[in-house]
């Protein structure tokens, strides 16, 4: 099973722009990517543009839109796609995901997205963004494919906004992205009823 990790090097994690500079977001996104690659043996980074930092990583540059890039690979062979910001996944989670039966296997995100996707069908195609989980379910059903939903708390957390950073700081000790956030001053304040993300 070929595993791809889609990655966008330019202006990543724009929803964090109020609390992180562009340089910080670029470095953070790269650390997230490395966390994911730590869990996906032999994975290929599917980059939307060229980036010098990918030089020593197995990667392919595909400047087409995400759906075209992903679907073109699904048409060729059994493929899995793991988003590059799933900092909390582990090798065990990825193995369990890859071992799940089905023509199509989807790990949904907390906010309606598709965080991991596996296709053993040449017919399947993707429609990422804007509630992609339900769209992918409908596509699989329309094509008459056997669909499995992969239920994982850690796989459901993709790091996009401040609330996601809080989850990473609560659950991600030992991860590269966690250590980077700590190095630039982020921490969790437990002084109130609910934990809050703070920056020194």
From Swiss-Prot:
- The enzyme class is transferase
**Molecular function via GO:** GTP binding; phospholactate guanylyltransferase activity
Query: Which keywords has UniProt assigned to this entry?
Result: GTP-binding, Nucleotide-binding, Nucleotidyltransferase, Transferase
Q: Does Nucleotidyltransferase appear among the keywords?
A: yes
Pfam families given for it? Answer: CofC (PF01983)
Q: Known EC number(s)? A: 2.7.7.68
The record, for InterPro entries, names:
CofC, Nucleotide-diphossugar_trans
Q: In which pathway does it act?
A: Cofactor biosynthesis; coenzyme F420 biosynthesis
Give one GO biological process term: F420-0 metabolic process
Membrane spanning stretches: none
Write out the catalysed reaction: (2S)-2-phospholactate + GTP + H(+) = (2S)-lactyl-2-diphospho-5'-guanosine + diphosphate
Membership in a protein family: Belongs to the CofC family.
Q: What does this protein do?
A: Guanylyltransferase that catalyzes the activation of (2S)-2-phospholactate (2-PL) as (2S)-lactyl-2-diphospho-5'-guanosine, via the condensation of 2-PL with GTP. It is involved in the biosynthesis of coenzyme F420, a hydride carrier cofactor.
Q: Which proteins does it associate with, and in what oligomeric form? A: Homodimer.
Name of the protein this chain belongs to: 2-phospho-L-lactate guanylyltransferase
């Amino acid at each position: 099973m070929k595993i791809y990790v889609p990655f966008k090097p330019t202006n990543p994690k724009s929803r964090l722009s109020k609390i992180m500079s562009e340089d910080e977001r670029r470095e953070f996104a790269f650390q997230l990517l490395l966390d994911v690659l730590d869990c996906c043996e032999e994975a290929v980074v599917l980059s939307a543009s060229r980036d010098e930092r990918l030089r020593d990583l197995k990667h392919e540059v595909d400047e087409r839109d995400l759906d075209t890039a992903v679907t073109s690979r699904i048409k060729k062979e059994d493929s899995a796609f793991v988003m590059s910001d799933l900092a909390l996944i582990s090798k065990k989670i990825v193995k369990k995901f890859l071992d799940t039966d089905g023509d199509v296997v989807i790990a949904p995100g907390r906010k309606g997205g598709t965080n991991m996707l596996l296709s053993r069908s040449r017919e399947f195609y993707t429609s990422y963004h804007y509630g992609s989980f339900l769209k992918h379910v409908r596509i699989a059903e329309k094509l008459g494919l056997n669909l499995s939903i992969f239920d994982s708390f850690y796989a459901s957390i993709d790091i996009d906004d401040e609330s996601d950073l809080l989850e990473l700081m609560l659950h991600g000790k030992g991860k590269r992205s966690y250590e980077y956030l700590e190095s630039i001053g982020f921490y969790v304040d437990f002084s109130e009823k609910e934990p809050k993300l703070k920056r020194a």
